[in-house]
Amino acid sequence: NLIQFKKMIKKMTGKEPVVSYAFYGCYCGSGGRGKPKDATDRCCFVHNCCYEKVTGCDPKWDDYTYSWKNGTIVCGGDDPCKKEVCECDKAAAICFRDNLKTYKKRYMTYPNILCSSKSEKC
């Protein structure tokens, strides 16, 4: 769920998730349209696509099982849908970490109105 996702992001990046990512670029936070502004925004685009593929549970609200082993997220549990959501969140948190060097403060609260180009397909 979103609370678990926030914890993953915080641990992976050291950044405060809501402040740093909830309104970043054209795809972080709710919805999304246009072309991703940079690699971090593309992480959100891919994460949104990942959530769209999930069926049988609610990615934003259903709890899943995960643990940390040697700084790595390990998704577990018996529910395949919830495990898939965990894998989506894990991939996004890793993507954010891997793109910290190109994170741009100017995209932190990017106005959605500027995301007007044609949306990419998943």
From Swiss-Prot:
Keywords: Disulfide bond, Secreted. Belongs to the phospholipase A2 family. Group II subfamily. N49 sub-subfamily. Expressed by the venom gland. GO terms for molecular function: calcium ion binding; calcium-dependent phospholipase A2 activity; phospholipid binding. This is Basic phospholipase A2 homolog. Residues 105-117 are annotated as: Important for membrane-damaging activities in eukaryotes and bacteria. It is found in: Secreted. SMART domains: PA2c. Disulfide bonds join C26-C115, C28-C44, C43-C95, C49-C122, C50-C88, C57-C81, C75-C86. The keyword Cytoplasm does not apply. GO terms for biological process: arachidonate secretion; lipid catabolic process; negative regulation of T cell proliferation; phospholipid metabolic process. One of its GO terms (cellular component) is extracellular region. Pfam families: Phospholip_A2_1 (PF00068). SUPFAM superfamilies: Phospholipase A2, PLA2. Gene3D superfamilies: Phospholipase A2 domain (1.20.90.10).
